[in-house]
Regions:
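Non-heme di-metal
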Residues: 1-324
Length: 324
């Protein structure tokens, strides 16, 4: 029995990824050469001359002033980072176990693991959250799994990781700006995390650019399913919608930021200039080029319909706070 059309399509895409291995090695080498490897203890420990107990007391005193809406944003950012096992699994399915893809996936996993660790350690040391509730949320999030509709298509995986890494970078960076006046130490942590997310974003965006060069019609078709909207990894966690709403109302991350991200990728990948496409590619190209206007209308609608709301989260000690 021969392969089905969908199976042939999948194997064709896997072949393209294999062809990309030399480029993966180049990008990985460049990534490591530019990187300054940091560890969570670089930010959380006291200076050698300082008293450890006093260091913790002062850190808690500064963190106490962080507003609850920003704490809620930080909780969602942290839990999103703790979903790393889901992404390692998704990438490992297509990247294989004996290639530079495996080397990249392992490196990316090791780097990303520090993001969740440093944020988790910081919030525990500063008593920023109800720690038991945070851990329960993390447990349930991982237990529920992450099974997106695109996980059967390796091209969609890379289109998704491109925009998801950029969105995560935006959220960490803006959260860092919001906490800077209260706790410069946390702002520094978030700045380092955001800058590393930016480097990961650059890697995945370049990979998808290379896929477009090799298989433009199928690449555009895959991207046309991802770019209209993405479910962030934490969408399955309890309270996600309200946490995301707080982030939007705070101006940390929302529909207009996603619009910027999509516009940025359309420009970088030069989607409007691609020619020589077959019917599949032309239809996908037209769909993608129409996405920004649709996202703009969504952002306008959300902002117009938004009304003042009161929130409370167990992880932020059930304290109520109102937001316009």
């Amino acid at each position: 029995m021969g392969l089905t059309a969908s199976a042939r399509e999948l194997w064709s895409k896997v072949d393209v990824l294999k062809d990309l291995e030399p480029r993966v090695k180049e990008l990985m080498d460049a990534h490591e050469q530019k990187r300054e490897l940091w560890m969570p203890s670089d930010f959380l420990g006291p200076d050698p001359e300082s008293c450890p107990d006093r260091h913790i007391v002062e850190m808690r005193k500064r963190a106490k002033g962080i507003p609850d809406p920003v704490r809620a944003a930080l909780a969602l950012n942290l839990l999103t980072e703790e979903g790393l096992p889901h992404f390692h699994r998704l990438l490992a399915v297509y990247l294989g176990d004996d290639s530079f893809w495996r080397e990249w996936n392992n490196l990316w996993t090791a780097e990303e693991d520090r993001h969740g660790q440093v944020l988790h350690d910081y919030t525990r040391d500063t008593l920023l959250f109800h720690q038991r509730k945070l851990e329960e949320m993390q447990f349930e999030y991982l237990r529920r799994g992450f099974h997106p509709s695109w996980d059967h298509d390796p091209y969609r995986v890379f289109a998704y990781t491109t925009v998801q890494e950029r969105a995560t970078q935006f959220s960490h960076a803006e959260t860092g700006r919001r906490v800077a006046e209260y706790e410069p130490g946390l702002a520094m942590i978030l700045d380092h995390v955001a800058r590393e997310e930016a480097r990961h974003f650059s890697f995945y965006r370049t990979i998808f650019e290379e896929i477009l060069k090799r298989d433009p019609d199928q690449a555009l078709h895959s991207a046309s399913f991802i770019l209209p909207s993405i479910d962030m990894p934490g969408a399955s966690m309890s309270g996600f919608k309200d946490l995301a709403d707080v982030i939007r109302r705070s101006g940390i991350y929302g529909p207009r930021d996603y619009l910027r991200i999509v516009q940025e990728q359309i420009r970088y990948w030069k989607i409007d200039n691609l020619d020589g496409l077959n019917e599949l590619g032309r239809i996908a190209q037209e769909k993608i080029l129409g996405i920004p206007e649709r996202l703009r209308k969504i952002a306008d609608y959300v902002e117009t319909k938004s009304k003042a709301k009161t929130f409370s989260f167990e992880v932020v000690f059930n304290r109520e706070f109102a937001m316009p």
